């Protein structure tokens, strides 16, 4: 559900057996063979619907009350007051290693966490283990969960941290292990009661073991948005499919987590707010995107400021131009998704960095208005910072990866990875990288990721990972034949059988790119993600509209597959060591 910020409660809608890369790398012919085999468990919606749900958008009175509480969570002054209260309660109390100060999710940022604080007489490192749960009736067994908290690996006498991974609606037993500098360890325990989950997600996902013996990568799977018609959360699941975190957000999606390096994490919490949550669970910064609405993705630049994909130009004149193109009344906003803004994390200032309409004016002018009344002519869904004013952008509507340089000066196209037929007559034909080999081109790709290599980046060669939705369609350009992207590309949504996790090598010296790795996965015409995980070149691929994600080994064999009963789809799944 997309909620307006503040206390305004008005709501509006937005948006089995898996095959190895050995066969997929056979090119278009191999891809067609895979398509003929079919994939089990693929969820297919109507063309252009994005799998929209018919569920009611009405919240219960309890959910409305909870949403007001969630809005209050992202108020820095209120969070500061909570921290001051915790400090006072701790100072008043006689707490110790044997009887630590414990508060269950005092900041309201993770239902399955608690705040812990105590002192020791000697300098020790600290770790903790959350006890498991035995299987009883329909309640599944839950394994133990162990972590070293932020700063816990540094010997100290004062200890303040967050415990994560608690079991919902359960009296959790937590064991603390303190290790002295001579190596001697001692333990103490406490219990903390958690409430039931606040959202409607599953406590336990359905998990199917794959044929690979490669261990799953460490970390937690972050479900970064489901576009529910109810309340919105970021969910964290462990490798067994057990929920280990429930982070409430005001609305929309959390998109991805960014880590400044101080133990905190930064994520979007609504269409106009980014938030920073420190290692103890306290919201310490909230940045507004001002006259812009964020969407899809964001990244750090070299100075640690936020580059955010955005819609709606700040000036009324720019808005009028887009409204006129979309034939909308002056009072209506029009989503264009063609801007990159910068949010200064020190001052909070917001500035426009890139307007893609200025770079591709003829393309924008040729685009048709979408059925929802928006001018979604380029639909940027990923941004990757390469350093030195250079970014990679993923354009779903043009099925093109775009490299821009000098974004803080004169933004310039360095190269395009897309269809030569689509870009014919655009004036950017010379910017196209030439595909080497026999493979269908990307169609509607998402989750583009820059994978530098110390040995090759300096020579102008690097890898690009992405989720190829393999769905050629764009309301903005109805006359273009997307079948020209290759024989394997799906142009009829109802006939989609598979998408791909793909890795390309881009060579800027020869102005070419080649497909070096590919995994065929359940079809998802929209949303979805791919990520390189662990130390063994495994790939995590989420097919959002199929509501499934799988971790594959380096040979393309599935290690484990997870299924989620999302209302619409899973927007994106990334794995983080939290």
What name fits each language-model region?
Residues 45-53:
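Bacterial Sec signal peptide processing site at the extreme N-terminus
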Residues 1-19, 27-38:
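N-terminal secretory signal peptides
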Residues 57-133, 155-160, 164-171, 175-578:
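Histidine-/acidic-rich catalytic cores in large beta-rich domains
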Residues 26-27, 50:
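Compositionally biased non-globular segments, especially hydrophobic aliphatic-rich helices
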Residues 137-154:
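Solvent-exposed serine/threonine-rich low-complexity stretches and specific carbohydrate-binding patches
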């Amino acid at each position: 559900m997309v909620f307006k910020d503040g206390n305004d409660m008005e709501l509006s809608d937005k948006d089995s057996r898996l095959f190895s890369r050995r066969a997929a790398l056979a090119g278009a012919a191999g891809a067609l063979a895979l398509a003929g085999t079919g994939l089990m468990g693929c969820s297919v919606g109507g063309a252009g619907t994005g799998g929209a749900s018919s569920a009611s958008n009405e919240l219960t009175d309890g959910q409305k009350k909870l949403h007001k509480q969630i809005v209050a969570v992202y108020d820095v002054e209120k969070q500061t007051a909570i921290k001051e209260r915790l400090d006072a309660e701790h100072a008043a109390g006689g707490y110790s290693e044997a009887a630590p100060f414990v508060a269950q999710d005092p900041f309201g940022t993770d239902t399955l966490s608690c705040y812990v604080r105590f002192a020791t007489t000697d300098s020790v490192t600290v770790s903790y283990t959350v006890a498991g749960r035995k299987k009883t009736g329909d309640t599944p067994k839950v394994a133990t969960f162990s972590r070293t908290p932020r700063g816990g690996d540094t010997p100290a006498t004062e200890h303040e941290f967050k415990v994560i991974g608690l079991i919902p609606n359960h009296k959790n037993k937590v064991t603390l292990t303190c290790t002295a500098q001579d190596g001697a360890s001692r333990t103490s325990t406490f219990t903390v009661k958690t409430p039931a989950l606040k959202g409607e997600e599953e406590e336990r996902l359905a998990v199917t073991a794959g044929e690979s013996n490669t261990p799953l990568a460490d970390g937690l799977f972050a479900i970064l948005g489901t576009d529910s018609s109810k309340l919105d959360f970021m969910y964290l699941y462990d490798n067994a499919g057990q929920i280990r975190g429930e982070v409430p957000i005001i609305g929309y999606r959390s998109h991805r987590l960014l880590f400044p390096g101080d133990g905190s994490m930064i994520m979007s919490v609504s269409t106009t707010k980014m938030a920073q949550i420190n290692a103890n669970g306290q919201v310490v910064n909230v940045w507004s995107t001002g006259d812009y609405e964020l969407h899809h993705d964001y990244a750090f630049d070299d100075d640690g400021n936020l580059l955010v994909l955005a819609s709606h130009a700040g000036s009324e004149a720019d808005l009028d131009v887009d409204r006129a193109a979309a034939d909308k009344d002056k009072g209506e906003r029009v989503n264009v998704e063609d801007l990159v803004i910068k949010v200064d994390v020190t001052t909070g200032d917001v500035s426009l960095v890139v307007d893609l309409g200025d770079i591709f004016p003829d393309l924008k002018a040729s685009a048709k208005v979408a059925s929802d009344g928006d001018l979604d002519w380029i639909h940027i869904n990923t941004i990757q910072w390469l350093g030195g004013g250079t970014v990679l952008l993923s354009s779903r509507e043009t099925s093109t990866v775009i490299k821009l340089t000098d974004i803080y000066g004169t933004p310039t196209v360095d190269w395009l990875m897309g269809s030569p037929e689509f870009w014919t007559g655009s004036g950017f034909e010379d910017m196209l990288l030439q595909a080497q080999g026999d493979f269908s081109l990307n169609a509607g790709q998402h989750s583009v990721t820059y994978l530098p290599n110390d040995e090759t980046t300096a020579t102008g060669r690097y890898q690009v990972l992405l989720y190829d939705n393999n769905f050629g369609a764009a309301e903005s350009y109805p006359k273009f034949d997307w079948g020209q992207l290759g024989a394997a590309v799906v142009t009829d949504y109802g006939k989609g059988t598979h998408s791909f996790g793909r890795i390309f090598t881009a060579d800027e010296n020869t102005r070419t790119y080649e497909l070096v790795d590919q995994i065929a996965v359940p079809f998802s015409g929209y949303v979805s993600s791919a990520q390189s995980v662990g130390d063994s070149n495994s790939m995590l691929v989420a097919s959002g509209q199929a509501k499934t994600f799988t971790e594959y080994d380096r040979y393309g064999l599935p290690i484990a597959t997870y299924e989620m009963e999302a209302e619409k789809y899973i927007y994106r799944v990334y794995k983080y060591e939290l």
